[in-house]
Design a protein with these regions (language model features):
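Short glycine/serine- and acidic-residue-enriched loop/turn motifs that recur at repeat junctions
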Residues: 3-27, 63-83, 115-134, 167-187, ...
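Hydrophobic loop/turn residues within beta-sheet-rich immunoglobulin-like superfamily modules
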Residues: 53, 105, 158, 192, ...
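Short coil/turn segments that connect the beta-strands within blades of beta-propeller domains
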Residues: 48, 57, 100, 109, ...
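C-terminal outer-membrane/trafficking sorting elements
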Residues: 350-358, 362-427
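Conserved core positions of repeat-based scaffolds
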Residues: 1, 49-52, 61, 101-104, ...
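Blade-level signature of beta-propeller repeat domains, shared across WD40, Kelch, NHL, RCC1
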Residues: 297-343
Length: 427
């Protein structure tokens, strides 16, 4: 990790103190985060916090805890926890946040939230007058959910039935077109049933459909919606992009990897986070360079991505060294990150281990087996959307795929031997 460490969010056991000359205010190069041999399979960062899900599904958190956003009971500490600390005994599939409200999904599909509740964004039926914050994860819904996200004061999620929901602050119609300004419980957004993923910006959201189209709604502050309109929208998602392989939403900018692996972006660009060499906002989707990309992440005012060849690049705001380039200068162009192997490196992804998926042409169920102990299995469709997930603790498991549409799917496993990918066809 790299960047600002004023609340201990780098997880290196330190935090910034202006009274200490040898402080740890920031890190201008990427450094590893370690926790007693724990293997992490995913990580997410908010402004002041970091969260990681281990290979066994356990959730770890560190950083500021002023509103209980670490989920660790105690509150009121700006620089709260300096190293990864286990939150609870639950098994987590998804955890996301942007500021001081966190939402997550257990492996059983139930939806949870904790942290700040200024506009009812926890979704537990209470506003800030009755519940200012939740210091431990609270259940939002017993139903099964696929994905979730939180903005500054609103939250949004996708149910297992493909419906889209939102709640919290509605001052910019980031929930729906109602005149109500606050919703303390989830409200359905439209009637479509083909939503698969969702992410939230400060006052807007972007959701992906099964056909690979990306839709946005809420405030168009700083051109975040990807279309030339001013102010807030009518609360109805509108299509912003087609043929999406993956995408990421920052503060008010959006990055998309298209199905041809090209990178596109739009929105806020004051700090060069769209890498077009300028500081002007971009109203509509615009291609960024000509390289091909495998993954990208939009931060608050900066961006990081990995190209097809495995090289890591960063650009945008760099006041705290978050670009990992060894300095604190902003970049308005793509800038390659050089890793020092002694300080941490990108983990190798294994693609040739003895992981097998059978039958290779399936109708009801597939079986995944390996010589190593598998910790998790994810299923992705041809557009790169995750359509299935299961925690595992063994060398073999079965997954029901009867609900999937016909087509080609990829099975990604995490095991003691590393990461592997196999393919099967749903008949």
């Amino acid at each position: 990790m790299s960047g600002n460490n004023d609340a201990g969010q780098l997880g290196d056991g330190h935090y910034f103190d202006s009274e200490i000359s040898d402080n740890h205010y920031n890190a201008t190069t990427f450094k590893p985060v370690e926790k007693d041999g724990v293997k992490f399979r995913s990580v997410t960062a908010t402004i002041y916090n970091s969260y990681a899900i281990a290979s066994d599904g356990a959730l770890y958190a560190w950083g500021q805890n002023a509103y209980g956003q670490l989920g660790l009971v105690s509150v009121g500490t700006y620089s709260g926890i300096y190293t990864p600390t286990k939150v609870d005994d639950a098994k987590w599939a998804v955890v996301k946040g942007r500021s001081t409200t966190i939402v997550g999904i257990h492996t059983d599909g139930t939806l949870w939230a904790w942290g700040k509740n200024l506009h009812g964004q926890l979704g537990v039926g209470a506003d800030s007058e009755t519940k200012e914050c939740a210091t431990t994860p609270e259940k939002v819904s017993d139903e099964r959910w696929l994905d979730c996200a939180s903005g500054f004061y609103h939250s949004t999620a996708v149910k297992a039935d493909g419906t889209l929901w939102a709640w919290g602050d509605n001052s910019q119609n980031q929930v729906n077109s109602s005149t109500a300004t606050i919703f303390t419980t989830p409200q359905q957004v439209g009637e479509d049933t083909d939503w698969t993923q969702v992410q939230a910006g400060v006052k807007m959201s972007a959701a992906l459909k099964a056909d690979g189209s990306l839709w946005t709604w809420g405030s168009n502050e700083e051109s975040a919606l990807g279309r030339a309109v001013e102010g807030k929208t009518d609360g109805k998602p509108m299509k912003a992009f087609d043929k999406v392989l993956s995408y990421s939403v920052g503060d008010n900018h959006v990055l998309v990897i298209k199905d041809d692996y090209t990178l596109w972006g739009w929105g806020y660009n004051l700090h060069g986070q769209l890498a077009d060499g300028t500081n002007r906002n971009i109203d509509t989707p615009t291609q960024i360079g000509t390289a091909q990309w495998q993954t990208v992440a939009a931060g608050f005012y900066h961006s990081v991505g990995v190209q097809i060849d495995g090289s890591v690049w960063s650009w945008g705001f760099n006041r705290y060294g978050q670009l990992g380039l060894g300095d604190d200068n902003n970049r308005a162009e793509l800038s390659k990150v050089d890793f020092n192997p002694e300080e941490g490196a990108v983990a190798e992804i294994t693609t040739d281990s003895a992981v097998k998926v059978y039958p290779t042409v399936a109708e009801e169920t597939i079986t995944v087996s390996s010589d190593a102990t598998i910790s998790s299995v994810s299923i992705y469709n041809a557009n790169g959307q995750k359509v299935g997930f299961k925690m595992v603790d063994g060398t073999q498991t079965s997954l029901n795929v009867s609900h999937l549409a016909a087509g080609t799917y990829f099975v990604a496993t995490e095991s003691d031997a590393g990461k592997s990918v196999a393919r099967f066809i749903k008949k």
